[in-house]
């Protein structure tokens, strides 16, 4: 415990809040190139083959990003837009790929929540 005199001389240090999306460097999204597209299995009570991609961002950081939605057209060297947002059952996956931008196509036959998956409105 510091004395009053020590506090007058030095003061207290402010806590620095650590960002959850450090690789984006403060940007809302970042462009990147897929270096590897693969599937991985989730943590314990869940079971699936989750689609993820290793992405080298323009900030020269390589991150693992989740590919949301059913089906995708991504492969190595695809240009993608990455946003923050973790996937709870995939350890180490703290970013998501934005569907319907750059080389990523939107989800086919999507009727609801279309804007999240880059799906165009169906002609009726």
Swiss-Prot record:
Cited PROSITE patterns: RIBOSOMAL_S12
Record has Lipid biosynthesis as a keyword: no
Ranges where the record places region Disordered: 9-32, 105-124
This protein's GO CC annotations: small ribosomal subunit
Gene Ontology MF term list: rRNA binding; structural constituent of ribosome; tRNA binding
Record key words, sorted: Ribonucleoprotein, Ribosomal protein, RNA-binding, rRNA-binding, tRNA-binding
InterPro entries assigned to the protein according to its UniProt record, in alphabetical order: NA-bd_OB-fold, Ribosomal_uS12, Ribosomal_uS12_bac
GO biological process entries: translation
Function: With S4 and S5 plays an important role in translational accuracy. Interacts with and stabilizes bases of the 16S rRNA that are involved in tRNA selection in the A site and with the mRNA backbone. Located at the interface of the 30S and 50S subunits, it traverses the body of the 30S subunit contacting proteins on the other side and probably holding the rRNA structure together. The combined cluster of proteins S8, S12 and S17 appears to hold together the shoulder and platform of the 30S subunit.
Family as reported in the entry's similarity comment: Belongs to the universal ribosomal protein uS12 family.
UniProt subunit comment: Part of the 30S ribosomal subunit. Contacts proteins S8 and S17. May interact with IF1 in the 30S initiation complex.
Name of the protein described by the UniProt record: Small ribosomal subunit protein uS12
Gene behind the chain: rpsL
